[in-house]
């Protein structure tokens, strides 16, 4: 059934006022088998709408190669929401932020020297239009005007915190309209003068993003002539980055009070209702005084936990919705997905990463090249060279390198440099003797591209310039791209993992029946874990996250296979537990 949706003095659906109480669920952070469970729990809390971003890089990981299947099937997610009686807000903006790798932008954009992002640079816009030619026709039939559940779509995301290119915003608006988007278009920005002013574009409705003081925020928006009032992102929690000292939590009662006030004053989208998990290597990062990569979990201290459990915040939000709307939440039969501890996994084989990588195709160059120039976006890049003369290694500098580099001489780590340590030369406390024929390997990890701030364009990964040994540049490098696919295809044999070098470990465990579980890695250092070929995500002893979430659909009844890349030359026990540990 087709509907009309209009923004006037309020939101009107088929001529009747609609009070939007929405919650964010990112389809790309939840296994498809659990979409129904999460959406039903959203409805049962009293929400009438679900909101999601659409990350460009998740759907076009390589230029011109699109994927809208499985976990990427946004159309199926939207249709399921409709079948369950929910309206939908879509945010198909080129940039999403969202604590997601590169804010959703594809890293292959950075292969073009000098390209400017999120502006009217014709090189950037050409790629956006190619993407829209594929994406937007998929979304058009999902609009309420075509019988779907989509009420509105977003043009750009928090652009007022980034730039002021009005021509760019107008181009995005027009591109969506020309491709058939006829529901209202929106933007979302912080409710501050510069942000609202820079993010504004004619013919597009403005919304605000904030986590508290709704009365003051909305009053300011009213002064700027914005009506009706909507908070597109009510931040009810926050995200974690490695080493931040503990899982970010907000007081449930005070958060519920803020939420109740917000419902009284206008329309709201809860960010996040359910955070989910940044599976794979898709976590983003912030970079202020130092790089701060996000952890694998995107629990966000949301009303619904990472594994879909109802929290105190959920119950308080539900009560607030019922009290403010005067209607009880829909009666929805909810299930609690079982958890199970499967015990200790058994290691079956291990091998040095350098040995396993030796047979891979490599690119040869005079000087090192960045991941992006090598056609790689995520993972690790290995730079290998043979030293030609005898000398003493006193000083080493990796020029234009990011994010974390492990320097190995003949297979043994002699130096690890991270983030700001890569900005200058490193002087060895004890000089390292080098002989002709010695092999120098440098393994560089992309720990997550920054997803917010002006630094978006300035973050090629790997080594993008030179390696300076003592006081001279070293030339002649073989470069191997070790992305998720390449690493997960490696098969360790035997049990030969040196104590001071990256290695891959194979393990197995038995699951008599499938249930949610949590992977604990006591004694391990840093790396990535795969389960039955699926990338669960990163681990790091720095915390705060101590266990990785494993949804039941990823398990097999019977034997399950784990592959662990451990970059610190460590090993320990591996346990499958029935409780999370986010720190």
Regions found by a protein language model. Give the residues of each.
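Aromatic-lined substrate-binding rim segments of carbohydrate-active enzymes
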Residues: 35-101, 173-178
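Aromatic- and acidic-residue-enriched segments that line the glycan-binding/catalytic groove
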Residues: 64-70, 94-118, 169, 173, ...
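Catalytic-core region of carbohydrate-active enzymes that cleave or remodel glycosidic bonds
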Residues: 86, 178-179, 209-305, 309-312, ...
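An active-site-proximal structural segment forming one wall of the substrate-binding cleft
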Residues: 74-90, 113-150
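Aromatic-lined ligand-binding clefts that engage carbohydrates, nucleic acids, or primary amines
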Residues: 393-408, 509-532, 539-540, 562-565
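Active-site neighborhood of glycoside hydrolase catalytic domains
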Residues: 124-201
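The substrate-binding groove and active-site-proximal loops of carbohydrate-active enzymes
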Residues: 20-32, 56-74, 110-130, 154-165, ...
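N-terminal carbohydrate-binding accessory modules
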Residues: 1-49, 79
């Amino acid at each position: 059934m087709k509907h009309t949706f209009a923004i006037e003095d309020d939101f009107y659906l088929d001529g009747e006022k609609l009070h939007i109480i929405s919650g964010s669920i990112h389809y790309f952070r939840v296994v498809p088998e659990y979409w129904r469970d999460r959406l039903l729990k959203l409805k049962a809390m009293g929400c009438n709408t679900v909101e999601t971003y659409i990350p460009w890089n998740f759907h076009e990981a390589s230029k011109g190669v699109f994927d809208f299947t499985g976990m990427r099937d946004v159309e199926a997610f939207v249709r399921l929401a409709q079948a369950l009686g929910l309206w939908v807000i879509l945010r198909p903006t080129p940039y999403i932020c969202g604590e997601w790798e590169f804010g959703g932008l594809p890293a292959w954009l950075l292969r073009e020297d000098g390209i400017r992002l999120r502006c009217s640079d014709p090189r950037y816009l050409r790629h956006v239009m190619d993407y829209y030619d594929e994406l937007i026709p998929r979304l058009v039939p999902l609009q309420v005007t075509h019988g779907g559940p989509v009420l509105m779509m977003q043009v750009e995301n928090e652009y007022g915190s980034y730039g002021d290119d009005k021509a760019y915003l107008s181009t995005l608006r027009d591109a969506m309209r020309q491709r058939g988007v006829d529901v209202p278009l929106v933007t979302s920005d912080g409710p501050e003068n510069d942000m609202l002013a820079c993010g504004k574009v004619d013919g597009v409705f403005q919304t605000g993003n904030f986590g508290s003081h709704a009365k003051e925020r909305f009053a300011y928006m009213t002064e700027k002539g914005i009506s009706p009032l909507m908070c597109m992102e009510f931040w009810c929690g926050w995200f974690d980055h490695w080493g931040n000292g503990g899982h970010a939590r907000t007081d449930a009662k005070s958060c519920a009070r803020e939420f109740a006030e917000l419902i009284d004053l206008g329309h709201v989208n809860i960010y996040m209702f359910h955070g989910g998990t940044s599976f794979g290597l898709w976590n983003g990062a912030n970079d202020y005084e130092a790089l701060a990569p996000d952890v694998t979990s995107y629990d966000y201290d949301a009303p619904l936990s990472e594994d879909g459990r109802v929290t105190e915040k959920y119950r308080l939000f539900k009560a607030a919705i019922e009290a403010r709307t005067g209607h009880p939440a829909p009666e929805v039969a909810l299930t609690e997905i079982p958890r199970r501890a499967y015990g200790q996994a058994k290691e079956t084989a291990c091998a040095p990463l350098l040995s396993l990588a030796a047979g891979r195709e490599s690119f040869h160059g005079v000087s090192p090249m960045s991941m992006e120039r090598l056609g790689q976006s995520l993972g690790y890049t290995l730079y290998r060279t043979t030293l030609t003369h005898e000398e003493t290694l006193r000083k080493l500098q990796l020029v234009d390198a990011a994010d974390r580099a492990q320097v190995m001489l003949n297979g043994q780590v002699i130096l690890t440099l991270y983030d700001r340590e890569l900005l200058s030369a490193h002087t060895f406390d004890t000089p390292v003797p080098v002989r002709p024929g010695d092999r120098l390997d440098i393994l560089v990890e992309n720990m997550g591209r920054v997803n917010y701030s002006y630094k978006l364009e300035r973050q090629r990964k790997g080594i993008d310039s030179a390696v300076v040994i003592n006081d001279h540049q070293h030339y002649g490098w073989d470069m191997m791209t070790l992305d998720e696919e390449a690493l997960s295809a490696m098969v360790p044999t035997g049990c030969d993992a040196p104590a001071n070098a990256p290695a891959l470990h194979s393990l197995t465990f038995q699951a008599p029946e499938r249930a949610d579980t949590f992977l604990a890695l006591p004694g391990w250092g840093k790396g990535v874990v795969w389960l039955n070929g699926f990338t669960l995500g990163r681990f790091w002893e720095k915390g705060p996250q101590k266990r990785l979430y494993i949804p039941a659909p990823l398990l097999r009844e019977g034997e399950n296979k784990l592959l662990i890349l451990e970059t610190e030359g460590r090993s320990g026990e591996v346990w499958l537990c029935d409780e999370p540990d986010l720190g």
